[in-house]
Amino acid sequence: MEKSKLLTALKTERAKLEKCLAAIGFSRMNIAGISGFYSTKDILAHLEAYDRALVVWLKESRAGRVYVDHILDQPDLDARNAIVYETNKDRSAADIVSTFFHTLDELEALIELFTDEELTDAESTAWFVVPRWQRRQELWKCIANDSYEHMQQHLPDIERWLTEQCSNY
């Protein structure tokens, strides 16, 4: 995928999420039950943790270093998500929202630094992709997986809850 298409996909999902968050408002972001017992705030903290790890991983690769996140790169999905939840459960919704969008801004800026060739040539990026993803794949797929595709996984739960709660959404 070309850089421009990757950025467009990321910005499109970001806009959808921003619309949902505006409809929810800070006062309702702590209400549990959006997805299991998780609140909107919890889901955002979860997304931000993965985006943050992606940002650090990309920054390290630009500096010629391999980065493996010792929490988010462990194979047990439930364990790593539990750690993310415990780490963030006492943070305010305002703090999480602010951090989330700041992290997305950083991610977009980092994506701009990569060429289309770097994003699509699995050979040239294998040195830092394989240690984190355990397989050779195009860099854009790694970025998509932990950013806009991850938002796409969680947006339906938020939208469903909003539809149930707000007749004007």
Q: Where do the model's predicted regions map?
A:
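Extreme N-terminal tail/first-helix region
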Residues: 1-16
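A short, mixed-charge helix-start or loop-turn motif at secondary-structure junctions
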Residues: 3, 86-90, 136-140
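Conserved short-loop catalytic and cofactor-binding motifs
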Residues: 5, 31, 84, 95, ...
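Hydrophobic packing residues in well-ordered alpha-helices of helical domains and bundles
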Residues: 7-10, 93-100, 144-147
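Structural signal for well-ordered, non-membrane alpha-helices
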Residues: 14-25, 51-55, 59, 101-115, ...
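Short, contiguous alpha-helical
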Residues: 30-79, 122-169
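Acidic/histidine-rich alpha-helical segments that form the ligand environment
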Residues: 79-121
